[in-house]
Regions:
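Active-site neighborhood of phospho(di)ester-bond hydrolases with catalytic His/Asp-centered motifs
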Residues: 43-45, 67-77, 93-95, 122-125, ...
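Active-site HxH/HxHxD metal-binding segment of metal-dependent hydrolases
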Residues: 22-27, 45-116
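Short, acidic/polar N-cap/turn motifs at the starts of alpha helices
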Residues: 29-31, 109-110, 130-132, 171
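Conserved beta-strand hairpin/beta-sheet module of binuclear metal-dependent hydrolase folds
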Residues: 3-60, 132-150
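Short Gly/Pro-enriched turn/cap motifs at secondary-structure boundaries
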Residues: 22-24, 121-126
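Metallo-beta-lactamase
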Residues: 49, 128-197
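Short, hydrophobic/aromatic-rich segments at coil-to-beta transitions
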Residues: 9-14, 115-121
Length: 197
């Protein structure tokens, strides 16, 4: 089965562009918003200077916290998840389940579709539980990769990755399908031959 989303009807925006220069002490997550049909999806609502960096851009689009239907967590590091509680009514998705209120449903993220245009795939490497969100828009396939890449320049060798070979294999898998990559802590960039592996 191809990783490419079957649909091309979704739209996305980056709510706030994160940063990192090393392994600390400062870091901010790149937080993104995807919409497709009735779904309003926030990806990696992590560390930011203020919650307004997430809620403000949503409000500018007419979307309140309670309107968000789904949150996808690329992995369970606090810098990518710390503001998930802003969206208490949403379904939370990770590598192994969907959570809502006080219930969860086990399911593997691999190939799970939120819609035909929004697909999850497992991409371990930065952590053993990494998930990438592949989004089919009318113009491109956009990959929200969490920390497979922290920013456009890598880092090539992730200093916290438990398995660099798996990281590289997951990066290659994403590059085989994506036109645009949204990293965990920086601006979006083209998925081309300049991307560090």
């Amino acid at each position: 089965m191809s990783d490419t989303p079957r649909g091309r009807t979704a739209d996305y925006t980056i709510l706030t562009t994160g940063y990192t220069t090393s392994t600390g002490p400062g870091v901010a997550a790149t937080v993104s918003y995807v919409t497709d049909g009735d779904l309003h999806i926030v990806i990696d609502p992590g560390m930011v200077a203020s919650r307004d960096r997430i809620l403000g851009p949503l409000a500018a689009r007419g979307v309140g916290a309670d309107d968000v239907t789904d949150v996808v967590l690329s992995h369970h590091h606090p810098d990518n998840t710390i503001n998930a509680g802003l969206f208490g009514r949403a379904r939370m998705h990770d590598h192994k389940a969907v959570y809502q209120a006080d219930q969860w449903t086990d399911r593997d993220a691999e190939g799970h579709e939120l819609t035909p245009s929004v697909r999850l795939i497992r991409t371990p490497g930065h952590s053993a539980q990494d998930v990438t969100v592949l989004v089919g828009t009318p113009d491109a396939v956009v990959a929200f990769v969490g920390d497979l890449w922290w920013r456009p320049d890598g880092p090539v060798e992730d200093p916290v990755a438990p398995d660099l070979a798996r990281l590289r294999a997951s990066r290659e898998r994403v590059l085989a399908v994506a036109d645009v990559i949204v990293p965990g802590h920086g601006p979006a960039f083209a998925a081309d031959e300049a991307v560090p592996l």
